[in-house]
């Protein structure tokens, strides 16, 4: 930790203070108890439920490495493997179901800047806090995006947000027109990845097609499939039963908080003396006014991590922003 307190300017009537702090912590797990398994879980869980991410102590990594078993499954070339739902005409990433490291919760550094300006009896102070780095899991973004409640889920919803426009030509297996035939949509998108071996889909022509090893883009260009609806894409990518880790809810946490602004005034001694006091001052303060920078999508509160346990990394709901305002009268006798 480094702290630097400075007075860049001072004269008879003016004084300017400028202070900085910088904190960085590097750590590494050297050894675990012989009875421990591959790692010791701290917070969260893998393998069941709707969390599917866990902070852990693992030899060779930092305290608080993040592990998940719902990373997208990939082939040897790094391509995401897609599964298919015929009923929804939707493709979605398969889960790896292997515990894999997806990052760690430790910030790269913490810092603060505070400055104060005094002119005669009038004073002003402002303080900023900041954090850069370390991953958090924002479950409000995950499930909010799955059901279309977040601003980030607007992407592809219409032409104005990048959605593809097409008129459906889907036929039933007997060659008759399906219920969507002739309907024009504006919310199309093409998911990334290739279909798993053995994947069969009902195509636009109502017939079954083997799309093993084919990308969705190729299936679209070959006239087998139509674009996928944005609502289905977000739902499959984020819901509890099929969702995978993605940038929509696993984020690098960075913020600069406007922590405090205070304005104060110290009355002349002759005024304080009228009430029998030696000192009399008044100040107005506002704390937690907002964020000059916030890396989290959908304006999520970056300080919404629940609890004070050292292994906690989850923001589990949309916590409101709170600020407080105070007026203080200082009297000295």
Model region roles, listed by residue range:
Residues 1-333:
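Outer/extracellular conduits and scaffolds centered on Gram-negative outer-membrane beta-barrels
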């Amino acid at each position: 930790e480094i702290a630097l307190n400075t007075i860049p300017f001072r004269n008879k009537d003016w004084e300017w203070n400028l202070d900085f702090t910088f904190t960085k912590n590097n750590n590494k797990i050297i050894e675990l108890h012989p009875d421990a398994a591959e790692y010791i879980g701290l917070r969260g869980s893998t393998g069941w439920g709707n969390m599917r991410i866990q902070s852990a102590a693992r030899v060779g990594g930092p305290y608080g490495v993040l592990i998940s078993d719902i990373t997208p499954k990939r082939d040897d070339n790094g391509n995401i493997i897609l599964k298919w739902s015929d009923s929804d005409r939707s493709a979605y990433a398969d889960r790896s179901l292997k515990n894999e490291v997806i990052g760690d919760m430790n910030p790269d550094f913490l810092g603060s800047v505070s400055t104060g300006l005094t002119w005669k009896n009038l004073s002003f102070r402002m303080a900023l806090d900041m954090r850069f780095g370390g991953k958090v899991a924002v479950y409000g973004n995950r499930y909010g995006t799955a059901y279309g409640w977040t601003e980030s889920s607007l992407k592809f919803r219409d032409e104005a947000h990048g959605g593809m426009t097409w008129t459906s030509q889907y036929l039933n297996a007997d060659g008759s027109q399906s219920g969507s035939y002739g309907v024009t949509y504006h919310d199309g998108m093409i998911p990334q990845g290739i279909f798993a071996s053995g994947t069969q889909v009902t195509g636009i022509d109502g017939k079954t097609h083997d799309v093993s090893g084919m990308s969705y883009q190729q299936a679209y260009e070959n006239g087998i499939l139509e674009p996928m609806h944005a609502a289905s894409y977000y739902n499959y990518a984020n819901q509890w039963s099929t969702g995978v880790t993605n940038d929509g809810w696993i984020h690098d946490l960075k913020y600069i908080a406007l922590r405090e602004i205070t304005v104060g005034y110290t009355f002349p001694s002759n005024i304080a003396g009228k009430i029998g006091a030696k000192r009399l001052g008044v100040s107005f303060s506002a704390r937690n006014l907002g964020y000059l920078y916030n890396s989290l999508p959908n304006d999520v509160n970056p300080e919404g991590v629940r609890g004070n346990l050292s292994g906690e990394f989850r923001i589990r709901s949309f916590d409101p922003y709170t600020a407080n305002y105070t007026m203080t009268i200082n009297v000295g006798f």
